[in-house]
């Protein structure tokens, strides 16, 4: 049964962590040391070759010692914060990493977004000495939601954040109710020293709190002006109560099935928020939140330099994690004010006097959130849409027909389409109502970038809507064209 967090010590200032050292009992066993040496040697070789080294070193280390993640993490004095969910993982972990750094801590973070166990192991190796001793003192881990049940059998984080659960890659992931059951089964054995940080507005995520015997901290958006009626914010991925399977009712829907929900059949309802945005104002390049639920009841302003209501949720998740770490609100808000987007997450890249705004989209909910952000900021965008169908994207691209392009189509000034499934995307845009004279298919990543730039007047913004492997290819092309560094150099 979930235990609410009520400690009055939240938001107390945490000083810089004390110096630490490993005792002989804490030192990694010989097998972990061997795994560390093998992984770090692989990392060094890849770096000599100019490669990113964000996954393979971890794969090598785990082949030598399957417990390397748990053993390397165990030496971190402040424990680990793990962040999972369908959307928002990379942004939230970056925000948490910035916050703990602002508090004087030294995070170990899989910052590149490589979020399978191999990516997590690679990040730990990058931080560790050759003998396996950490240089950092707190882990900030982005975890792929399908991998969490396996990872949690070996790793017990101090904090586990779940951002949301939406329908995603149907050929790779379970349907969300099955995934939720697996997550609940993995959460059940966690010790009561682990704090869950859950999205109260997502009924599937909120119900995970019932699987945990330790503290649970809920966050959400309380602003009555954010959201609308059921069905107005995209296709819902969850219409049934996670407890009794009765129909859910909503007084306000923010996105898909996220909002102010309740079940008339069994009485389950959106839980009280420990941290909430009483007001959210979204601008073209930033958002302002007024935070309720802090000590004293004041509405504290929080500015984040990225637009979109979904980024308000990411910021709330990060602030809730900071609260669970006893990092002060002023420290956390200062860190968020200086936040710089991760690659592909509303990242802006200057090119020939234009700005390319990269937006990773991988499922209908994420696409609809991006579309909503474009519409609510009044843009008439020039689009570069890149659709791939590799394993990391989803082999099944039929999900693009669930994205609400019809809402965006009248605002599109021009669209360049590229990728392995460019013609599927072009057909989708055509059926959404984009006239053929405003739509062009361009094969080749660099050629598509050049075409989008050439079409846009100097000073204009090009919004790049891209799936994951297409993002990697576009980012590589942008690097080769001299507009940006490789993402692993960030």
Give the location of each predicted region:
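ATP-dependent carboxylate-amine ligase
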Residues: 18-47, 51-56, 238, 245, ...
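Short amphipathic alpha-helical face segments that pack within enzyme cores
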Residues: 95, 119-122, 316-320, 369
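Phosphate-binding loop of NTP-binding sites
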Residues: 19, 24-220, 224-232, 236-240
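Acidic, Mg2+-coordinating active-site environments of NTP-dependent enzymes
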Residues: 162, 166-354
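Short, surface-exposed acidic/glycine-rich loop or hinge patches that mediate macromolecular interfaces
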Residues: 86, 114-115, 296, 307-309, ...
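Low-acidity, Ser/Thr- and Arg-rich intrinsically disordered low-complexity segments
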Residues: 4-16
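Structural signal for short hydrophobic segments within the conserved structured cores
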Residues: 106-108, 217, 300, 437-440
């Amino acid at each position: 049964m979930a235990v609410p967090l009520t400690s009055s010590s939240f938001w107390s200032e945490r000083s810089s962590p004390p110096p630490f050292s490993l005792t002989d009992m804490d030192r990694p066993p010989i097998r972990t040391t061997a795994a560390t040496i093998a992984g770090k040697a692989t990392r060094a070789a890849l770096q000599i070759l100019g490669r990113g080294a964000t996954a393979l070193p971890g794969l090598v280390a785990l082949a030598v010692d399957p417990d390397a993640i748990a053993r390397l993490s165990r030496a971190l004095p402040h424990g680990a914060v793990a962040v999972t969910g369908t959307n928002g993982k990379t942004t939230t972990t970056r925000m948490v990493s910035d916050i703990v750094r602002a508090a004087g801590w030294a995070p170990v973070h899989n910052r590149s977004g490589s979020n399978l166990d191999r990516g997590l192991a690679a990040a730990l190796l990058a931080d560790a000495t050759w003998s396996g001793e950490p240089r950092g003192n707190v882990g900030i881990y982005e975890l792929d939601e399908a991998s969490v049940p396996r990872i949690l059998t070996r790793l017990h984080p101090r904090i586990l954040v779940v951002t949301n659960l939406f329908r995603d890659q149907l050929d790779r992931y379970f349907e969300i109710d099955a995934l939720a059951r697996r997550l609940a089964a993995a959460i059940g054995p966690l010790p009561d020293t682990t704090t869950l940080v859950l999205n109260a507005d997502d009924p599937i995520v909120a119900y995970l709190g019932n699987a945990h015997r330790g503290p649970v901290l809920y966050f959400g958006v309380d602003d009555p002006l954010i959201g609308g009626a059921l069905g107005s914010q995209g296709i819902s991925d969850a219409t049934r109560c996670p407890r009794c399977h009765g129909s859910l009712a909503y007084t306000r829907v923010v996105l898909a099935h996220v909002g102010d929900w309740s079940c008339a059949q069994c009485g389950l309802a959106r839980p009280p928020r420990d941290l909430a945005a009483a007001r959210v104002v979204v601008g073209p390049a930033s958002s302002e939140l007024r935070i309720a639920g802090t000590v004293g009841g004041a509405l504290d302003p929080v500015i984040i330099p990225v637009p979109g209501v979904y980024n308000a949720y990411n910021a709330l998740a990060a602030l809730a994690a900071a609260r669970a770490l006893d990092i002060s609100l002023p420290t956390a808000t200062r860190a968020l004010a200086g936040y710089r987007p991760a690659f592909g997450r509303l990242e802006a890249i200057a090119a020939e006097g234009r700005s390319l705004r990269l937006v990773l989209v991988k499922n209908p909910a994420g696409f609809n959130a991006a579309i909503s952000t474009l519409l609510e900021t009044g843009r008439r965008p020039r689009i570069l849409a890149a659709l791939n169908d590799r394993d990391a994207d989803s082999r099944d691209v039929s999900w693009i027909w669930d994205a609400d392009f019809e809402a965006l189509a009248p605002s599109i000034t021009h669209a360049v389409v590229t990728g392995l499934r460019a013609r599927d995307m072009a057909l989708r845009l055509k059926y959404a109502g984009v006239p053929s004279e405003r739509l062009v298919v361009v094969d080749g990543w660099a050629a598509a970038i050049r075409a989008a730039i050439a079409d846009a007047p100097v000073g204009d913004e090009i919004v790049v809507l891209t799936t994951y492997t297409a993002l990697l290819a576009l980012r590589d092309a942008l690097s080769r064209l001299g507009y940006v560094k490789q993402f692993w150099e960030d």
